[in-house]
């Protein structure tokens, strides 16, 4: 008797506890005032059930109330199971609608969990059902099965036959036809108004759904890294060299978020366009970058890659894009990359790169912050490993900004005792702003005639260092600095902003010095960065190109220019404004990078900080012998007369001719040609055209006789 009396009390206690739990669960979805437990319950429900978390919490609340206030079995078992099935169909359809394209299983579950927390999709439970359904029967088959089972569960819950419902609706429609014309018109008007209201409500719901942002966790991580890096700067204040404050550089602007629906629509357009040309392929992954979005495409068996590559223009037309670049295949993947420009380019600021953990932890003092790749990862290059860099790009493509980013990266990474720079700027206006910083070895060289002398000094410094290494029994600058820490040698970075201007003034000397430095200077700690806006073969000669394997190409005007700099096409498809192809030494294919941007105001702020806090100490570099070509008469070559005899006999003058006939090296033959030009015997350098003999034979003989006297 006592047990029977206590049974209702126990059930009531269980019911109250159940009601309290469901009430907390229900409120945790709408408010943050439920504490730590409520917060975790809400995250769990959203992560596992997505938008269905609101439905299941409401159902549990109703069940708790019915369990507490009714003494009978309030719902039959088959209806309970049907209700559960209907709920699973709801979250599965929701998941399938928002995320139909499958990725890696773990990535798909991870995205579903994060999206569920942000009230999108069907959470982990919905993603599990959808993943296996799509794998088995595809997207269309999944929709058919889910809708069919939804109808079955509705029938089980309501006990209403769908067939009888359709028949009764048809009978009512027949009866309605018998009504008078006046009533028909009124009914039609009423239906139209109702449809307008319904369509308006549907539009509002769609807009609300589209406004839901997909969470990007990278933003929070970047902010944390910035705080850490600012602390790192503060810790260095007591040392000999303090890099400029990071606050001198502009902060990054939050990137505009592209809706998943837009990306899925573009993926479908790509598949449809290829299908129209008889190519079956499927987009398996979409990667959004700062400037472009890459669609990874897997063609069906038997489809040639060249067929897809040939449809570049057709894909651009279908997607209404200014240009489309195809990477076939993507290195390390069995997929083809279709790179489509974003409607809005997200600028990558240099602060975002320098302020990153990757740049801060980079061990080399010659670290260069280039920008971000397609996946949004920060790209850092090591100039010490390149060991030289060739940069080319048309006007306005971002070449000068890249050079500024490179220089400022070195200023933040290395002290003047570690790295010194020689800046050669024939254009005068680009690099002059850096005069006075402590990292400069000599003031910015703006005279093209003096530039050859500076390069000659670099060659002599390289030879001196190799002699020093030989005397001390070491192989390179790293070994020397490690062994003799008190006599450390600084590394030298030579930056030439416009190579074509130097090649026009003294091509033979400049080519020879660059050739020698590119071949031998790496171990001596001397590195070249050469930039040009005219990547033609008379500027980037075969000798220079063969000895500088690392290259960066910005947007160029033609495929020929792209082949000249990269040995392949593709640079003509770039967007400009910092869009580059980075081809480091050892890479199988170039990496597409959105270059880091730094404004003139930021450069000026960094330079002013260094000028105010540090004094510049220039080394004396003697360049008199190379600044005036007329001094060549003072060191006339012994074989000059023999060279004159050769050109008079053959009727032509060239370096290669003197090399063959006189059996001398390139440098000596080039020097003799320069001396003949200064004496007015032969014409000057004119690109690919051969030099002409200007003076008649008699005048030449008089000059030589005068010299012998």
UniProtKB/Swiss-Prot annotation:
Alphabetized GO MF terms: ATP binding; ATP hydrolysis activity; DNA binding
GO biological process: cell division; chromosome segregation
Signal sequence extent: none
Cross-referenced CDD domains: TrwB_TraG_TraD_VirD4 (cd01127)
Record's keyword terms, sorted: ATP-binding, Cell cycle, Cell division, Cell membrane, Chromosome partition, DNA-binding, Membrane, Nucleotide-binding, Transmembrane, Transmembrane helix
Keyword Plastid found: no
Pfam family, one: FtsK_4TM
PROSITE patterns: FTSK (PS50901)
Annotated InterPro entries: AAA+_ATPase, FtsK/SpoIIIE/SftA, FtsK_4TM, FtsK_alpha, FtsK_dom, Ftsk_gamma, MFS_trans_sf, P-loop_NTPase
Annotated compartments: Cell membrane
Residue ranges of the TM segments: 13-33, 48-68, 82-102, 114-134, 137-157
Gene3D superfamilies associated with the record: 3.30.980.40, P-loop containing nucleotide triphosphate hydrolases, Winged helix-like DNA-binding domain superfamily/Winged helix DNA-binding domain
Cytoplasmic side: 158-709
Top-level taxon of the source organism: Bacteria
Record's subunit section: Homohexamer. Forms a ring that surrounds DNA.
Function: Essential cell division protein that coordinates cell division and chromosome segregation. The N-terminus is involved in assembly of the cell-division machinery. The C-terminus functions as a DNA motor that moves dsDNA in an ATP-dependent manner towards the dif recombination site, which is located within the replication terminus region. Required for activation of the Xer recombinase, allowing activation of chromosome unlinking by recombination.
Written domain comment of the UniProt record: Consists of an N-terminal domain, which is sufficient for the localization to the septal ring and is required for cell division, followed by a linker domain, and a C-terminal domain, which forms the translocation motor involved in chromosome segregation. The C-terminal domain can be further subdivided into alpha, beta and gamma subdomains. The alpha and beta subdomains form the DNA pump, and the gamma subdomain is a regulatory subdomain.
Protein name per Swiss-Prot or TrEMBL: DNA translocase FtsK
Species in which this protein is naturally found: Caldanaerobacter subterraneus subsp. tengcongensis (strain DSM 15242 / JCM 11007 / NBRC 100824 / MB4)
């Amino acid at each position: 008797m006592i047990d029977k009396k206590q049974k209702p009390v126990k059930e009531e206690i269980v019911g109250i506890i159940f009601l309290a739990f469901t009430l907390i669960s229900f409120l945790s979805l709408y408010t943050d005032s439920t504490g730590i437990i409520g917060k975790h319950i809400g995250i769990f429900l959203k992560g596992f059930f997505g938008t269905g978390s609101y439905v299941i919490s409401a159902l549990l609340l109703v069940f708790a109330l019915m369990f507490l206030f009714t003494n009978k079995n309030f719902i039959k078992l088959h209806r309970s199971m049907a209700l559960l099935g209907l709920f699973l169909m709801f979250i599965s359809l929701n998941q399938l609608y928002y995320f139909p394209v499958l990725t890696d299983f773990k990535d798909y579950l991870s995205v579903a969990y994060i999206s569920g927390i942000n009230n999108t999709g069907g959470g982990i439970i919905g993603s599990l059902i959808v993943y296996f359904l799509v794998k088995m029967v595809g997207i269309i088959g999944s929709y058919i099965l889910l809708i069919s089972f939804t109808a079955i569960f509705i029938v089980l819950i309501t006990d209403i036959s769908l067939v009888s419902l359709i028949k009764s609706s048809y009978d009512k429609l027949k009866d309605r036809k018998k009504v008078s014309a006046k009533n028909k018109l009124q009914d039609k008007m009423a239906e139209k108004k109702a449809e307008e209201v319904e369509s308006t409500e549907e539009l509002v719901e769609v807009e609300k759904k589209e406004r839901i942002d997909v969470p990007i966790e990278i933003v929070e991580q970047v902010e944390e890294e910035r705080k850490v890096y600012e602390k790192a700067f503060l810790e260095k204040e007591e040392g000999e060299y303090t890099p400029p404050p990071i606050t001198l550089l502009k902060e990054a602007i939050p990137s505009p978020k592209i809706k998943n629906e837009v990306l899925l629509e573009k993926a479908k357009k790509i598949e449809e366009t290829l299908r129209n040309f008889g190519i079956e392929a499927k987009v398996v992954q979409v990667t959004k970058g700062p400037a472009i979005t890459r669609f990874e495409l897997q063609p069906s068996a038997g489809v040639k890659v060249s067929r897809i590559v040939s449809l570049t223009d057709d894909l651009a037309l279908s997607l209404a894009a200014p240009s489309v670049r195809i990477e076939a295949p993507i290195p390390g993947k069995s997929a083809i990359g279709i790179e489509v420009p974003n409607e809005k380019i997200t600028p990558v600021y240099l602060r975002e790169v320098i302020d990153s953990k990757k740049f801060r932890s980079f061990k080399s003092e010659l670290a260069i912050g280039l920008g971000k790749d397609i996946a949004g990862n920060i790209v850092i290059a090591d100039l010490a490993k390149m060991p030289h860099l060739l940069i080319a790009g048309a006007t306005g493509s971002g070449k000068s900004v890249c050079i500024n980013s490179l220089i400022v990266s070195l200023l933040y990474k290395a002290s003047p005792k570690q790295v010194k720079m020689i800046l050669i700027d024939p254009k005068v206006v680009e690099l002059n702003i850096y005069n006075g910083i402590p990292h400069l070895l000599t003031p910015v060289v703006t005279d093209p005639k003096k530039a050859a002398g500076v390069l000659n000094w670099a060659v002599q410094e390289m030879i001196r260092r190799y002699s020093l290494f030989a005397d001390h029994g070491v192989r390179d600058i790293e070994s020397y600095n490690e062994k003799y820490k008190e006599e450390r040698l600084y590394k030298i970075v030579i930056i030439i902003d416009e190579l074509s201007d130097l090649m026009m003034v003294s091509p033979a000397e400049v080519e020879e010095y660059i050739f020698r430095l590119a071949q031998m200077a790496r171990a001596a700690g001397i590195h070249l960065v050469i930039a040009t806006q005219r990547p033609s073969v008379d500027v980037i000669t075969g000798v220079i190109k063969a000895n500088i394997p690392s290259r960066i190409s910005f947007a160029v005007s033609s495929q020929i220019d792209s082949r000249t700099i990269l040995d392949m096409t593709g640079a003509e498809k770039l967007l400009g404004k910092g869009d580059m192809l980075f081809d480091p030494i050892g890479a199988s294919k170039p990496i597409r990078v959105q270059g880091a941007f730094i404004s003139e105001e930021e450069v000026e702020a960094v330079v002013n900080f260094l000028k105010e806090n540090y004094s510049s100490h220039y080394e004396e570099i003697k360049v008199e012998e190379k600044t005036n070509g007329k001094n060549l008469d003072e060191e006339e070559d012994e074989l000059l007369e023999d060279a004159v005899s050769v050109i008079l006999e053959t009727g032509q003058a060239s370096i290669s001719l003197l090399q063959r006939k006189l059996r001398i090296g390139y440098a000596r033959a080039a020097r003799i040609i320069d001396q003949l030009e200064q004496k007015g015997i032969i014409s000057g350098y004119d690109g690919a055209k051969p030099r002409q003999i200007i003076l008649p034979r008699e005048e030449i003989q008089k000059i030589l006789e005068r010299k012998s006297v």
